[in-house]
């Protein structure tokens, strides 16, 4: 299931009214970050107790990630699941995806095999960004199980442990490390998406996650 354009849900009159009221604009998420990176580059934007990022650091880091994602063949309109705790990597990844017009599918950290299997299939995600482990749970092992049903699923691991590094070194594992994706070749990025392009698919946190 891939989302359509906003015109599938809103009439032309709705769109004009929202724009006239200033509720809708033409800036993308990355546009807004770029403005802040220029105006307050050294101000801390996010911290998680392990890492902190200023506006400029987030901007530059997201560009490097976006270049790495693009080099992997990820393109506008693709969907990528982001199954991370409240880490700064979550913000980096979502910002990088937004720069490319790739649709973020955030998954709550408490979701397990049944829920993530459904979301990954229903949203037709091509990849997932996940921890190796978090609070005693092995996320990487779970997604390797999902990959048995979806052998094309790419798995990127944030903050890997030694076991995750070893798996990433195995030929054909489908597992890579997020930090290894970063590149400095940001100049080759495609044009930015429109503010009207799909950006996010959110699944409910109800009893079925469906």
Question: What are these model-derived regions, one by one?
Answer:
Residues 80, 97, 198, 204-207:
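Conserved S/T- and glycine-rich ATP-binding loop of Class I adenylate-forming
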Residues 41, 174-176, 182-203, 210:
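Conserved pre-ATP/AMP-binding loop-to-beta segment of ANL
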Residues 1-26:
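Flexible, non-catalytic linker and terminal segments flanking ANL/adenylate-forming cores
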Residues 74, 78, 102, 209-210:
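Short phosphate-binding/catalytic loops that engage adenosine nucleotides
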Residues 84-86, 132, 159-160, 197:
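Helix N-cap/beta->alpha junction signal
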Residues 71-72, 95, 99-178:
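Structural core segment of the AMP-binding/adenylate-forming
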Residues 23-26, 34, 42-95, 112-117, ...:
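Conserved AMP-binding/adenylate-forming core of the ANL superfamily
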Residues 6-10, 14, 31-54, 160:
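AMP-dependent adenylate-forming
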């Amino acid at each position: 299931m891939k989302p359509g354009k906003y015109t599938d849900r809103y009439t032309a009159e709705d769109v004009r009214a929202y724009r006239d009221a200033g509720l809708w604009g033409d800036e993308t998420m990355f546009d807004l970050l770029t403005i802040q990176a220029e105006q307050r580059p050294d101000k801390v934007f996010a911290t998680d107790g392990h890492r902190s990022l200023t506006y400029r650091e987030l901007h530059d880091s997201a560009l490097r990630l976006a270049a790495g994602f693009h080099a992997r063949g990820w393109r506008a309109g693709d969907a990528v699941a982001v199954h991370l705790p409240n880490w700064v990597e979550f913000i980096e990844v979502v910002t990088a995806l937004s720069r490319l017009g790739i649709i973020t599918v955030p998954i709550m950290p408490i979701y397990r095999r049944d829920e993530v299997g459904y979301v990954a299939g229903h949203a037709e995600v091509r990849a997932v960004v996940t921890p190796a482990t978090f609070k005693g749970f092995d996320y990487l092992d779970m997604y390797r199980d999902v990959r048995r049903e979806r052998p094309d699923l790419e798995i990127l691991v944030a903050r890997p442990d030694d076991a995750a590094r070893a798996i990433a070194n195995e030929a054909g594992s489908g597992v890579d490390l997020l930090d290894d994706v970063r590149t400095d070749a940001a100049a080759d990025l495609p044009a930015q998406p429109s503010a009207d392009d799909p950006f996010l698919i959110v699944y409910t946190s109800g009893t079925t996650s469906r």
